[in-house]
Regions:
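Conserved short hydrophobic patches within well-ordered secondary structure
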Residues: 18, 43, 47, 72-73, ...
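N-terminal helical cap/lid subdomain that shapes the substrate entry/recognition surface
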Residues: 1-92, 100, 113
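Conserved SAM-binding loop
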Residues: 4, 11, 86, 104-107, ...
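Charge-rich, acidic-biased intrinsically disordered regions
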Residues: 94-101, 108
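Well-ordered alpha-helical segments embedded in enzymatic catalytic cores
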Residues: 89, 93, 146-149
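Ser/Thr-centric signal marking residues that sit
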Residues: 10, 14, 84, 108, ...
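Asp-based, Mg2+/Mn2+-dependent phosphohydrolase catalytic module
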Residues: 1, 98, 112, 116-211
Length: 211
């Protein structure tokens, strides 16, 4: 059996970090600041698309959007950790999986360095069996190649995938035996239900994940 996790919106709340970066650039360019509601609405498809969507809500000049998006990306990579915190129950659940000897993986569209920095800060005593990221040669989600690789390496038992967005669902479909979407993440319960996801895959707490 193996457990595979998304990072942002599933294990950690990175919105405060993202808003710090986004609003610094917006303020420097005399643009309206962003907030948590807007950030959740544009999150889930990677950093650059998030930054670009935030800027397109304010301006239409593509050159300026490209310039400011690049500035946001640089600022984020300088410090991807400050403000990011684990969701309640995440640390205990990961440690439980480690104690009972389960194989675990992280599949993230983040680069490996910022992802590792976040893990070291939020989960200092836990180590994933494997981490999959784009700069390690893996296609970003919704590609399921990384998930298929994990399944080939650890074929025994059920494969469980835990994410929080439609991107995660697409990644896990037809590969994972069980899929859970966290309602505390970027989409929330109401949005996930309105998007057509069945309630029996939605979880409000890590304790609802079957073993």
């Amino acid at each position: 059996m193996g457990y595979v996790f998304d990072l942002d919106g599933t294990l950690v709340d990175s919105v405060p970090t993202l808003l710090r970066v986004i609003n610094k650039v917006l303020e420097e360019n005399s643009l309206p600041l962003s907030d948590r509601v807007e950030n959740l609405s544009v999150a889930g498809w990677g950093l650059l698309p998030m930054f670009e969507k935030t800027l397109r809500n304010r301006i239409s000049d593509e050159r300026e959007i490209a310039r400011m998006s690049s500035e946001m990306l640089v600022l984020y990579r300088e410090d991807p950790v400050t403000g990011t915190v684990p969701y309640p129950g995440a640390y205990d659940f990961l440690m439980h999986l480690s104690e009972i000897g389960e194989h675990t993986a992280l599949i993230t569209n983040k680069l490996l360095t910022p992802a590792t920095m976040i893990l070291d800060r939020c989960f200092p005593d836990f180590r994933f069996t494997r981490i999959y990221s784009p700069d390690e040669g893996w296609e970003p989600k919704p590609s399921n190649l990384s998930l298929q690789d994990f399944r080939r390496r650890y074929p025994e038992g059920l494969l469980t995938y835990i994410g929080d967005t439609e991107l995660d669902y697409r990644t896990a479909s037809n590969t994972a035996d069980r899929i859970y979407l966290a309602t505390w993440g970027y989409r929330g319960r109401d949005r996930l239900i309105s998007d057509g996801f069945p309630e029996d895959i939605l979880i409000d707490d890590f304790s609802q994940i079957s073993e």
